């Protein structure tokens, strides 16, 4: 049915207000998407948390990036990617983990290939159970068994430490928990155990470990094959730990690099477009952060309790607890 903007907006407003009056503010929900522009993400998040007064706004980006977010927070204290696209142009080794970059991130893949054309010695490794299009241009493909990334990178961590490749000055100055990581990955000290767990041949495993140990400028890009997993957070941390141990981070051409599954999953996190966040990576359950954001917004409300996350949100819809939902830029069906 054709309608006007005014009629559509008025109808939505009336329906939302009716639900709020009858069932409370948490009867309303928004399900948004990593395909929204950052500005749109910001406005809808402000509207829901500051003007509707609920935190029931979540995104399909949670399904692809929540494990990376948790890994970043556990490693760095905040959700931050310590690199930029320009770093790929300065790297001497690029490790692609759980990513068919050629198909899923073609623009970045072409950028990596262009960098390799200017620097033919750039060593590209693909870690993926399948032989994909990305593997065709790689120098080394590691066909890992599904779900064994933690064993692989814990094995790399132990190899780097046991063979004197730790940057002890960096570790002492900027990290904590080294002994705990060494203790928790003790099994992976045995490279035969890593071979068995990962399904990767000893020759390929040694080539990978030795090449990474000898290369200063290393970027490890990890994506959906890492994140969309029951062990996603641990996988992310096992990758990041190797960079922290060797100091291959915070330098031109060297960093762990989590790649989103959708074009603006990171933008959504920047503006707080999740049920448990406020804008600018502020914490929704922190009273000081609540005050800062509400004052900046000049809004009548500010959500103070985490809303329903993606899966729980749709369970609440099924249970009849959510009376109205606005779905933006995605098709969850």
Question: Which residues does each PLM region occupy?
Answer:
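Cofactor-pocket helix-loop regions in the catalytic cores of large enzyme subunits
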Residues: 1-264, 271, 284-333
């Amino acid at each position: 049915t054709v309608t006007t903007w005014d009629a559509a907006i008025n109808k939505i407003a009336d329906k939302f207000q009716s639900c709020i009056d009858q069932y409370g503010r948490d009867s309303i929900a928004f399900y948004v998407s990593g395909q929204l522009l950052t500005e749109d993400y910001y406005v809808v998040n402000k509207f829901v948390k500051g003007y509707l007064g609920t935190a029931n706004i979540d995104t399909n980006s949670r399904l692809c990036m929540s494990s990376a977010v948790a890994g970043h927070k556990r490693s760095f204290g905040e959700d931050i990617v310590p690199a930029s696209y320009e770093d790929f142009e300065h790297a001497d080794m690029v490790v692609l983990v759980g990513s068919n970059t050629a198909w899923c991130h073609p623009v970045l893949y072409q950028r990596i290939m262009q960098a390799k054309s200017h620097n033919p010695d750039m060593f590209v490794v693909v870690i993926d159970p399948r032989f994909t299009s990305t593997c065709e241009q790689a120098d080394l493909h590691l066909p890992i068994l599904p779900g064994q990334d933690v064993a692989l990178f814990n094995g790399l961590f132990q190899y780097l430490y046991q063979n004197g490749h730790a940057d002890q000055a960096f570790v002492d100055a900027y990290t904590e928990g080294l002994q705990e990581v060494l203790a928790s990955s003790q099994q992976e000290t045995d490279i035969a155990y890593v071979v068995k767990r990962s399904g990767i041949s000893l020759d390929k495993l040694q080539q990978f470990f030795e090449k990474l140990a000898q290369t200063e400028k290393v970027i490890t890009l990890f994506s959906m094959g890492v994140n969309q997993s029951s062990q996603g957070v641990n996988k992310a941390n096992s990758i990041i730990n190797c960079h922290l141990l060797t100091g291959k981070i915070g330098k031109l051409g060297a960093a762990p690099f989590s790649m989103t599954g959708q074009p603006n999953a990171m933008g959504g996190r920047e503006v707080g477009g999740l049920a448990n966040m406020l804008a600018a990576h502020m914490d929704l359950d922190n009273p000081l952060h609540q005050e800062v954001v509400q004052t900046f917004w000049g809004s009548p409300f500010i959500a103070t309790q985490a809303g329903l996350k993606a899966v729980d949100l749709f369970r609440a819809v099924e249970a009849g607890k959510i009376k109205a939902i606005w779905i933006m830029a995605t098709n969850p069906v």
